[in-house]
Amino acid sequence: MNIIEGKLQLIGDERIAIISSRFNHLITDRLVEGAKDCFVRHGGRDDLLDLVLVPGAYEIPFALQKILSQGEYDGICCLGAVIRGSTPHFDYVSAEATKGIANVTLKYGAPVTFGVLTTDSIEQAIERAGTKVGNKGFEAMASLIELINLYRKIGA
């Protein structure tokens, strides 16, 4: 059996965009820093990394569609933080952001990763933004790097 997988190393000429929501910026700023750290640690050039800021997680799919339609990036890392409150708003935003990102990704067939936190509390979000549970922004970028390499191997 042949195993085909992407490696966690960039060539150095990959152009990557991070789309991040500004809402809950105390969390998303940390996710962005984690993603940037991963990108550079694994061979990426800082001048080939762009940050696109949108108001909230709900707006990520719109920006993703616009960016992918231009065909200028090797991959996109989507980051955000949706924290449950006392109203059903959390359910709507997290569901639509998730579905929107998935639909756009499948439409364009491009390497995209999902690093949008959906947590029950601010404490859980903080834990996933670089404290107890690691940095999910770093992990989303690591997945993107592997996905870009896999995409190349399978002849996309």
Swiss-Prot record:
Alphabetized UniProt keyword annotations: Riboflavin biosynthesis, Transferase
Keyword Transmembrane assigned: no
Keyword RNA-binding: no
Recorded superkingdom: Bacteria
Active site per UniProt: 89 (proton donor)
Enzyme class: transferase
GO molecular function, a single term: 6,7-dimethyl-8-ribityllumazine synthase activity
BP GO annotations: riboflavin biosynthetic process
Catalytic activity: (2S)-2-hydroxy-3-oxobutyl phosphate + 5-amino-6-(D-ribitylamino)uracil = 6,7-dimethyl-8-(1-D-ribityl)lumazine + phosphate + 2 H2O + H(+)
Pathway: Cofactor biosynthesis; riboflavin biosynthesis; riboflavin from 2-hydroxy-3-oxobutyl phosphate and 5-amino-6-(D-ribitylamino)uracil: step 1/2
One GO CC term on file: riboflavin synthase complex
EC id: 2.5.1.78
Residues the record lists as binding 5-amino-6-(D-ribitylamino)uracil: 23, 57-59, 81-83, 114
Binding site for (2S)-2-hydroxy-3-oxobutyl phosphate: 86-87, 128
InterPro entries recorded: LS, LS/RS, LS/RS_sf
One Pfam family recorded for the sequence: DMRL_synthase
Function: Catalyzes the formation of 6,7-dimethyl-8-ribityllumazine by condensation of 5-amino-6-(D-ribitylamino)uracil with 3,4-dihydroxy-2-butanone 4-phosphate. This is the penultimate step in the biosynthesis of riboflavin.
NCBIfam families noted in UniProt: lumazine-synth
PANTHER family: 6,7-DIMETHYL-8-RIBITYLLUMAZINE SYNTHASE, 6,7-DIMETHYL-8-RIBITYLLUMAZINE SYNTHASE DMRL SYNTHASE LUMAZINE SYNTHASE
HAMAP family on file: Lumazine_synth
Family: Belongs to the DMRL synthase family.
Name of the featured protein: 6,7-dimethyl-8-ribityllumazine synthase
Lineage: Bacteria, Pseudomonadati, Campylobacterota, Epsilonproteobacteria, Campylobacterales
Gene: ribH
